[in-house]
Amino acid sequence: MEKLKSELWMTAVATCMSLLLYLTILRRRHASGGRSLALPPGPTPLPLIGNLLCLGGIFHQTLAKLARVHGPVMTLKLGLTTAVVVSSAEAAREAYTKHDQRLAARPVPDAFRANGFSERSIVFSPSSDPQWKNLRGIHATHIFSPRALAALRGIRERKVRDIVGYIRTVAGEEMCVREVVHNGVLNLISTSFFSMDMADVRSESARGLRGLIEDIIATVAGPNVSDFFPFLRQLDLQGLRRQTGSHLGIVFGLLDDIIDRRMAETRDHPDKQRHGDFLDALISLASAGKIPRYHITYLLFDVFAAGADTMTTTVEWAMAELLRNPRVMAKVRAEVTDALGGRESFDEGDAASLTYLQCVFKEAMRLHPVGSILVPHLAVQDGVEIGGYAVPKGTTVIFNAWAIMRDPAAWESPDQFLPERFLHKEESSSPPLELRGKDYEYIPFGSGRRLCPGLPLAERAVPFILASLLHAFEWRLPDGMSPDDMDMTEKFATANVLATPLKAVPVASHTS
């Protein structure tokens, strides 16, 4: 008994001495500038709720204001979760070039855990997952490759002509640019994917699909107590996971109906000419055993959820800035007119060759990025260091693209709409800025492994839509409104949109 007591006492003494030695070494490493780093600075968190009360207003603007006080690499406590916010081009460069692999996972919003969605979606699967690599390869090879997009160029041109054709019927009247363009973009995407218009059609399932996807994204974009306090997830106190699960079930049912009918058509009529759309390609992959059948449904949902908002919102912001800046409007319309000569038709290749138009597109994406806050990253390993601060494993990393692309250290007159800034880049000896995330002051589509896979479609379709609208119509503000009267207030919801939808009057300048 005495021996046991002695051993326990010696063990306790050894444990205490080891702990004291560890604390001494740790203190000395901090004092001597060792590699044990602190978290970035940030606003003082309140008990339990952290910094949640600091985040009112427009989210990306609020984060930018906080960064001006606490620095371009900043810590926020969001309830019981820790986030590091990156707000400068230099900090973004360091994060993406040195730690892209360690930051290649995503934190999953609790609402998207419904129906196992997060486990099958390319958006939330970690890049180390073989499933993610397979899906990424499908996007790159069968959906957004130059060859695949070129094959469906005629469909995109036809759908953009449909937009122009509809606007001709209301020429001279005030119209909501967002609504008209959104319908056209939905049809462009849906016809490219499965040869069906999703807007202004008689199909109840088509209209229902559009509305449900919008509801799902709006629900997930809202604040959820389960994301701030993970121990409450099981309770789903706001019911957002249940609501999302219900909507996802309906959407997947509608998509599955479209897919199953096509698969039955392919099976029952093997000699019938195929549609030549993306759905045909995906069904071929599933039939060959290269992807499971359910991946087709998830791929279609991911593209619809992200694609329509991105293209519509960029067109609206670009049109708003052109109406607000008559000099730029006149210059880009002159380029379009001169390039076409006396031709009345306009195609996607024409838009790609117009230098100033491309500058307008890039500047609209810089000043008003649709994803003002990029889809957050998650540190999956220790060892991440940004700006001299530690980003521990399990930390959410938020890239404020809106702040990065207005960083005064990287941009001259960053808050002004100046397409010429990209023109000057083209004419200088340095390489022109591109959309693909290699220029870290300009990341509207993200960067690294998680670069938006739909970028190739957007960079073709958006300038083409813009050029078509500018070629076919002279655009004016409603009666009595001057450019200075325009409301350019942002609203951050599912995307960074105009708080007041743009209203404008198209006046026909060409006939088809």
UniProtKB/Swiss-Prot annotation:
Q: Which UniProt keywords apply?
A: Heme, Iron, Membrane, Metal-binding, Monooxygenase, Oxidoreductase, Plant defense, Transmembrane, Transmembrane helix
The record's GO molecular-function terms, alphabetically, read: 3alpha-hydroxy-ent-sandaracopimardiene 9-beta-monooxygenase activity; heme binding; iron ion binding; monooxygenase activity; oxidoreductase activity, acting on paired donors, with incorporation or reduction of molecular oxygen, NAD(P)H as one donor, and incorporation of one atom of oxygen
Question: Mind telling me which GO cellular component terms the entry cites?
Answer: membrane
Cofactor(s) required, per the database record: heme
Which Gene3D superfamilies does the annotation name?
Answer: Cytochrome P450 (1.10.630.10)
Q: Which catalysed reactions does the entry list for this protein?
A: ent-sandaracopimaradien-3beta-ol + reduced [NADPH--hemoprotein reductase] + O2 = oryzalexin E + oxidized [NADPH--hemoprotein reductase] + H2O + H(+)
**What does the induction field say?**
Up-regulated by methyl jasmonate.
> What is a biological process (GO) this protein takes part in?
diterpene phytoalexin biosynthetic process
Predominant location: membrane
Q: How does it sit in the membrane?
A: Single-pass membrane protein
Which parts of the sequence bind heme? Answer: 452
Annotated membrane-spanning segments are 6-26
Primary role: Enzyme of the diterpenoid metabolism involved in the biosynthesis of the oryzalexin class of phytoalexins. Can use ent-sandaracopimaradien and syn-stemodene as substrates, but no activity with syn-stemoden-19-oic acid. Hydroxylates 3-alpha-hydroxy-ent-sandaracopimaradiene at C-9-beta, resulting in a 3-alpha,9-beta-diol corresponding to oryzalexins E.
Stated name of the protein: Oryzalexin E synthase
